[in-house]
């Protein structure tokens, strides 16, 4: 009997739950198609592990990054959520606001300028996206 350790590279924009689903499907397929395999451990990665591990060792954690983003975030209404992507030794931030909180185009231009200055001064953050949601529909049970 064998134990299998597999690494599957995926698009960095998939959700955590989709990554988990890919891992479960991969595990099931290997077990069903190889009777000599007793168990499979599937790692879902967005980058090559060796490259990712060496580049991401010096990136700050979420709380530190949110503090670093404070100069920009303080100019916005309270975000509904902030999503951080650790890619290539840098960080991409997605900030989600409701549409009604951020409809003024003059305010939008001011924030765009602040984001441009922030990115120029902070090379760790490779991009910062501000997303507007018109409405969040409730989850049905």
Language-model segment annotations:
Residues 1-141:
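Peripheral (non-transmembrane) domains and long loops of multi-pass membrane proteins
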């Amino acid at each position: 009997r064998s134990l299998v350790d597999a690494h599957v590279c995926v698009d960095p924009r998939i959700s955590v739950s989709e990554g988990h689903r890919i891992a479960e499907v991969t595990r099931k397929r290997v077990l069903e198609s190889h009777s000599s395999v007793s168990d499979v451990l599937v790692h879902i990665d967005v980058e090559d592990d060796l490259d990712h591990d060496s580049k991401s060792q010096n990136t700050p954690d979420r709380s530190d990054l949110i503090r670093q983003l404070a100069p920009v975030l303080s100019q916005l209404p309270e975000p509904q959520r902030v999503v951080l992507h650790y890619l290539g030794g840098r960080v991409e931030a997605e900030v989600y606001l409701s549409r009604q909180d951020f409809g003024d185009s003059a305010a939008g231009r001011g924030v765009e300028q602040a984001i441009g200055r922030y990115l120029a001064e902070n090379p760790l953050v490779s991009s910062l996206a501000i997303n507007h949601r018109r409405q969040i529909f409730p989850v049905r049970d």
